[in-house]
Amino acid sequence: MCAALRRNLLLRSLWVVLAIGTAQVQAASPRWEPQIAVLCEAGQIYQPQYLSEEGRWVTDLSKKTTGPTCLRDKMDLLDYCKKAYPNRDITNIVESSHYQKIGGWCRQGALNAAKCKGSHRWIKPFRCLGPFQSDALLVPEGCLFDHIHNASRCWPFVRWNQTGAAACQERGMQMRSFAMLLPCGISVFSGVEFVCCPKHFKTDEIHVKKTDLPVMPAAQINSANDELVMNDEDDSNDSNYSKDANEDDLDDEDDLMGDDEEDDMVADEAATAGGSPNTGSSGDSNSGSLDDINAEYDSGEEGDNYEEDGAGSESEAEVEASWDQSGGAKVVSLKSDSSSPSSAPVAPAPEKAPVKSESVTSTPQLSASAAAFVAANSGNSGTGAGAPPSTAQPTSDPYFTHFDPHYEHQSYKVSQKRLEESHREKVTRVMKDWSDLEEKYQDMRLADPKAAQSFKQRMTARFQTSVQALEEEGNAEKHQLAAMHQQRVLAHINQRKREAMTCYTQALTEQPPNAHHVEKCLQKLLRALHKDRAHALAHYRHLLNSGGPGGLEAAASERPRTLERLIDIDRAVNQSMTMLKRYPELSAKIAQLMNDYILALRSKDDIPGSSLGMSEEAEAGILDKYRVEIERKVAEKERLRLAEKQRKEQRAAEREKLREEKLRLEAKKVDDMLKSQVAEQQSQPTQSSTQSQAQQQQQEKSLPGKELGPDAALVTAANPNLETTKSEKDLSDTEYGEATVSSTKVQTVLPTVDDDAVQRAVEDVAAAVAHQEAEPQVQHFMTHDLGHRESSFSLRREFAQHAHAAKEGRNVYFTLSFAGIALMAAVFVGVAVAKWRTSRSPHAQGFIEVDQNVTTHHPIVREEKIVPNMQINGYENPTYKYFEVKE
């Protein structure tokens, strides 16, 4: 009976084995269920397909999509599910766990679906779920059923797949099948249920054809041409319409609160980092776990920030397939988040199927921690002797798993700050590693310079690579964050438009029509359309402001799409007013009021009055006005930049000129100093020779005075003017002789020469010269001016002695000063020590030590000796305090 039951279980679980598309896990349910499939290929746009109740994939060309590109956004996928299955209550979607081969793809614009004969593709479809849908999992004999539920975790399909695989791996088992638990958002859930089986569980091996296709490749969503279907009442199954006037007023106040903050949102859009156009993978990083960052971030709906156009889907797991050299089996290393909830660690699971056809069994993928655990504790792994390589990656930011449209703006801002801090920490780690390598290089250079130089080259190359990788990673993360924010803002705007249109159409069809309800719903629709318009204009202005000529080029390429989007919004406004005109009574009451309301909304955009009209020319004029303003700002910035550059060059030239002038003055000063030194050196020999001549003359003049004796000296002293008279007489004789010689020379020129006169003149001159040389000269300060102006030898000796005495006096002064200061310091220190000791004594504190031996007649015990010391420190007997309190 047990064998029959086992066979029955194996037959019932055959559909599970057939769904092994990725060699990891099986699907949960083979029965028919609503599903849609989307094919996204570069350069090709295909219509999505849905699974009919007959089990065939069908393309319905009448069901329009929300954009010109393939469906990537979760909200768009959910909307298409609702369109494909209008009779079902579709509230959520989830990615299928296996691939299906689907053909008959129709390109966008095809007119007949029967003629579409596109080649078959392996696609992973999306399941359209109801309010709550739990899959039944088969539990074969020897396997275990378990589930993980954490209300604080709102994770996508892939993340819970990893969590279940890790939980099975901890038990030494492998995950056989799994299913999602309670949903907490669009395509995000708060738990997983799974079945774990032994690693060597016997099951039939099946050859499965697998193709490596991404589920949702990262790309920008061009939402510029979001189409508002005005007359399709099947777009949504909920309505904000209420027949209660109070509820309408509350909804209206909420929308007005959002619109009042719209200017702040648009202004903040320019200051927000738009990210880099790079959409490549962000590379490896080592940030902390998601468990460390688990806060709820709040922000109002009015804080929707209009960022740059283009949005990316949620962070998906990117896998790398590689061949294990030891065993030849294929292993997978993840470039995705790896986090562990409180119940179990997370192990990666594949998102892409391998390319080659091969016989596979259900072997779970291993994360870095799980692989290390298996390598250490189990030696018979199915993938070979060694653990598969895995790349450690940071956990995803909570922003990607927590979404509330009312708090989207604040969550985005907090996530931006968190991303900047994480990037700053990574840069700090890289710089620290660089410092360590630099120290190592300095040590190596002392031992082996050649090896050190080679090491430095490798080190520099690796550092440059690391810095570049960090920059690319940071740009990719910023772009991913901005793209997700853009996606959520656009989805929220579209949701508001759909809800407002549903409310408006229901209010118009109400019998009898309620003018107040129609007015409120139409105002809500007009505000939603205006918000979409403000978003388009803000994005266009952001492109203009994003980077000078490059931003202008990007805005020029985006202008046609922006203009078309504005025209579509104007067309929707006109259609809504046309719908109102079909009801003359309502139109007569509120038509003029609604027209004024439209103009009031348009006036909030800082648009000239001539451009408020809803026409293509007016919209083009608005875009041209923005472009002209930005071009004027760019030209002004360029002019200011050139002027600043010229000022800097002028200041640099002035500084250079001042520097040259300073150098010239310094050179001139040095030249003057050198010239003065040379002049002093040349004057020193002249002065010494002059002094020696003066000394010789003084000695010669002193000799005649000594020969005359004391009598002559007395005569000279008695008649001091005698020498002066003689010198004047000698000077007159000399002048007379010179005059005679000169007259004689003049007479020689005459034709007649008197020889006798010449002879007499010569004799007179010779006699005068002989008489002048024989007569001694008197020492006089006018005669020897140079000798009297120079210092004598005795004065120089006296100056040297005076300088030596002054130097000795200064030394004595310094010694006495130092001794006095030291003595004063010693006195102060002694006084301070004495005061400190005095203050520490009990007598100074008002206590008097009592001799216990004198006052008492009984011997003193040890405790009683301690009591006085305790009382000094403030001790009070508790017995006394007790009686005092009692009294």
From Swiss-Prot:
| Signal peptide extent | 1-27
Q: Which residues lie on this side of the membrane: Cytoplasmic?
A: 835-887
Question: Position of motif YENPXY motif?
Answer: 875-880
Domain of life the protein comes from: Eukaryota
Q: Which Pfam family is one of this chain's hits?
A: APP_Cu_bd
InterPro entries reported in the protein's UniProt record: Amyloid_Cu-bd_sf, Amyloid_glyco, Amyloid_glyco_Cu-bd, Amyloid_glyco_E2_domain, Amyloid_glyco_extra, Amyloid_glyco_heparin-bd, Amyloid_glyco_heparin-bd_sf, Amyloid_glyco_intracell_CS
- According to the entry, every stretch annotated as the E2 domain falls at 395-597
Topology with regard to the membrane? Answer: Single-pass type I membrane protein
According to UniProt, the tissues expressing it are described as:
Expressed in postmitotic neurons in the central and peripheral nervous systems. Within the nervous system, transcripts are not observed in neuroblasts, newly generated neurons and at least one class of presumed glial cells.
Query: What is a GO molecular function of this protein?
Result: heparin binding
Q: Where is this region: Disordered?
A: 225-365, 377-396, 675-743
User: According to its UniProt record, where is this protein located?
Assistant: Membrane
Q: Which PROSITE patterns match?
A: APP_CUBD, APP_E1, APP_E2, APP_INTRA
Spell out where the chain is glycosylated. N150, N161, N237, N240, N574
Q: What is one Gene Ontology biological process annotated in the Swiss-Prot or TrEMBL record?
A: peripheral nervous system development
Subunit composition? Interacts (via the intracellular domain, ICD) with APP-BP1.
Family membership: Belongs to the APP family.
Record-linked PANTHER family: ALZHEIMER'S DISEASE BETA-AMYLOID RELATED (PTHR23103), AMYLOID-BETA-LIKE PROTEIN (PTHR23103:SF15)
Per the record, what about its domains? The NPTY motif mediates the interaction with clathrin. The clathrin-binding site is essential for its association with X11-alpha, -beta, and -gamma. The sequence specific recognition extends to peptide residues that are C-terminal to the NPXY motif. This interaction appears to be independent of phosphorylation.
State the name under which the record lists this protein: Amyloid-beta-like protein
Protein source organism: Drosophila melanogaster
